[in-house]
Amino acid sequence: MINDLKKDSEQRMQKTLESLEQGFAKVRTGRAHPSILNGVMVPYYGSDVPLNQVANVGIEDSRTLVVQPFERTMVSAIDKAIRESDLGLNPITADSIRVPLPALTEETRRDMQKVARSEAENAKVAIRNIRRDVLGDLKSLLKDKEISEDDERRAGDDIQKITDKYVAEVDKRLAAKEAELMKV
């Protein structure tokens, strides 16, 4: 029972780390990466769909993405969706869509760093909330006399160690992202 709680908490914390990585992927660094356009939604036959479902996104060079729509009729809709996204990108349209990424200014890098820190802080809060939920479950098991006080205390210490491990991992990933952002 206690082991199930530990495994469940560890799985939930791992999902939080995966979510953090997805959040970090949206933070633009100086280099082109297809995941920059992951959040762009394109109108397609009456509903909004992710860009990667209507086009291939590739890298032309270190500062340029290439978007090749599966259907030629989608070029203008994709162009418009990229322009209207909050990414500040201006695509160049021909048969395919080229998306040059402007060089990041120092100010933009600082703003991106703030966004990355915010994502990391949200991940830490989520991890701590998972810990709180599991500790609450342990307390209710103790109250129902399904586990002893010693078991509850030992399991609580184990959960704290797991939490510390994942919070340290969030800090490590944030430091790596900040270093990547500040690299010119």
Curated annotation (Swiss-Prot):
Keywords: Cytoplasm, Protein biosynthesis. One of its GO terms (biological process) is cytoplasmic translational termination. GO terms for molecular function: ribosomal large subunit binding. Coiled coil: none annotated. Pfam families: RRF (PF01765). One of its GO terms (cellular component) is cytosol. It is found in: Cytoplasm. Responsible for the release of ribosomes from messenger RNA at the termination of protein biosynthesis. May increase the efficiency of translation by recycling ribosomes from one round of translation to another. Belongs to the RRF family. This is Ribosome-recycling factor. It comes from Acinetobacter baylyi (strain ATCC 33305 / BD413 / ADP1).
